[in-house]
A protein has these predicted regions:
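C-terminal regulatory/interaction module of P-loop NTP-utilizing enzymes
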Residues: 1-98, 103-372
Length: 372
C-alpha cells in the first residue's frame, strides 16, 4: 500500500506552480481520472490574458511535434538546428504556461526532446519568454497504465503526489452535515454537477476512496483486481455521468441506464439510476421560484435533500430570495436548510448571499450568523 503521505490537493498543486513554477517544473503524479489536467485550467483562469496557454497531450506526440531539424549556414558551414513547434509558444512575446499532460506515456525519443524544456525552458537555441511556467502530469506507476520515467528524466522535475479528492461530507459536533473544504463536493456544488450525481456521491462516499489507501471499494479502479471488473468512478467519470443525467429527458430509461453503467461501472450506474428516479419527484422548479410560499414541499426527506442540492447548484442573484423563502417553511427540514446556507457562504456564490437581506435575516434568526 503506497498511501497518500506527503501529498497535496489539486488546489495545493496549483499553488506550487504559482509560487515556483517559473523556476522549477513540477511533475504531478496521481491516480487516473482525479483531475490533474484541471490544474492547468485553474491556472489559466487565474492568470487570464497575461499568459499564453498550451496543453500538450503526450500520448499522441511524435518527435516532429516537439522540434524539426532544419539546415542553416553559420560561418560558411551548413549545420543542423532544431525549430520548435509553434504550439509551444516560443515565438510569442508574453510568458507561456505549458503543461505536458500524461508525460509518462510519451515515446522515449519524444520524451528526450522534451527534457530541455522541462529543465532549462529551452528547445535547441530557443528559450521560452521570461516568466514562463512549465508543468507536467503523469499517472501513478502503480496504476499499471505504462506511466514510467527513467532516472535521468525524472530528475529534471520535482515530482509531487496529488491525492484523490475525497467525497467531502462532514458531520459537526451537533450531528449536522456540512461540506468539507478542498473536497469533490465543494467542487461539484460550484461547477454545475447534476444534483442526482451529487446525491449519489453523498450516499456512496466510498466511490471516491483510493486503492492507494487500501480501499477495497467495488466502485473504484484498482489495478490489483481482474481487468474485467468495470469499476471506475473518479472525478472525471462523475462529470461524464453528470452530462448524461442532464439529458435524461431526451433519452429512454434503457439508454440512460446503459450510458451511466458505461461511464462509471455497472454497480454505480444502477445505484445512480436510483437517484435519477428520485429526481423525478422534485417539484416543478419554475413554480417553486414563482410561488415559493405555496409551492408543494416533498415529504420524503431524501427528496428534500436533493432539492437543497439543486438549489445550491442553481442559485443565482435573482433566485436566492425565492429559494430562501421556500426552505424557511415549516415542512422543510431545518438540517437541509442549514446545509444550504453554509454551502452558499463557502462557495463562489457568497457575494450574492452577503447582499441578500432575506438570506442574512434568516441566518441571524436561526443563529447561523452571517453578516454583511
Amino acid at each position: 500500500m503506497i498511501g497518500y503521505n506527503h501529498s497535496v490537493s489539486l488546489r495545493g498543486a496549483s499553488n506550487l506552480v504559482k509560487v515556483l513554477g517559473h523556476e522549477r517544473t513540477f511533475l504531478f503524479e496521481g491516480e487516473t481520472g482525479i483531475g490533474k489536467s484541471a490544474i492547468f485550467y485553474s491556472l489559466m483562469n487565474y492568470y487570464g490574458d497575461k499568459m499564453g496557454y498550451n496543453i500538450i497531450d503526450c500520448t499522441t506526440l511524435d518527435v516532429g511535434d516537439i522540434q524539426m531539424p532544419r539546415v542553416v549556414e553559420m560561418n560558411g558551414m551548413h549545420v543542423t538546428v532544431f525549430a520548435p513547434n509553434h504550439l509551444l509558444g516560443f515565438q510569442d512575446d508574453k510568458p507561456q504556461l505549458i503543461m505536458f499532460d500524461e508525460l509518462g506515456k510519451a515515446p522515449q525519443g519524444t520524451l528526450n526532446g522534451i527534457l530541455p524544456i522541462l529543465q532549462e525552458r529551452r528547445q535547441g537555441m530557443n528559450y521560452l519568454p521570461e516568466g514562463s511556467f512549465v508543468l507536467a502530469t503523469t499517472n501513478c506507476a502503480s496504476d499499471g497504465l505504462m506511466d514510467t520515467l527513467k532516472a535521468h528524466q525524472r530528475r529534471r522535475t520535482v515530482k509531487v503526489l496529488v491525492r484523490k479528492p475525497h467525497a467531502g461530507i462532514g458531520v459537526d459536533e451537533n450531528g449536522k452535515e456540512f461540506v468539507e473544504p478542498d473536497s469533490w463536493m465543494e467542487y461539484a456544488l460550484d461547477n454545475d454537477i447534476a444534483p442526482e450525481v451529487i446525491m449519489f456521491v453523498r450516499n456512496h462516499p466510498d466511490c471516491l476512496e483510493s486503492y492507494l489507501d487500501g480501499s477495497d471499494s467495488k466502485r473504484i479502479f484498482n489495478p490489483s483486481r481482474e481487468p474485467s471488473v468495470d469499476a471506475f468512478v473518479c472525478p472525471f467519470t462523475l462529470e461524464v455521468a453528470s452530462d448524461i443525467v442532464k439529458v435524461k429527458q431526451k433519452i429512454s430509461e434503457e439508454e440512460l441506464t446503459a450510458s451511466l453503467c458505461g461511464a462509471i461501472g455497472t454497480l454505480s450506474g444502477v445505484d445512480l439510476m436510483t437517484e435519477v428516479k428520485m429526481g423525478y419527484k422534485l417539484p416543478d422548479w419554475g413554480n417553486l421560484l414563482s410561488n415559493p410560499k405555496t409551492a408543494p414541499i416533498p415529504e420524503d426527506t431524501m427528496v428534500q435533500c436533493m432539492l437543497m442540492t439543486k438549489a445550491i447548484v442553481t442559485t443565482a442573484e435573482d433566485t436566492l430570495t425565492a429559494l430562501c423563502q421556500y426552505m424557511m417553511r415549516d415542512k422543510f427540514k431545518d438540517e437541509w436548510e442549514a446545509v444550504f446556507y453554509r454551502s452558499i457562504m463557502s462557495s463562489k456564490k457568497q457575494e450574492i448571499a452577503i447582499d441578500n437581506d432575506t438570506f442574512q435575516k434568516r441566518a441571524m434568526e436561526m443563529n447561523w450568523i452571517f453578516t454583511k
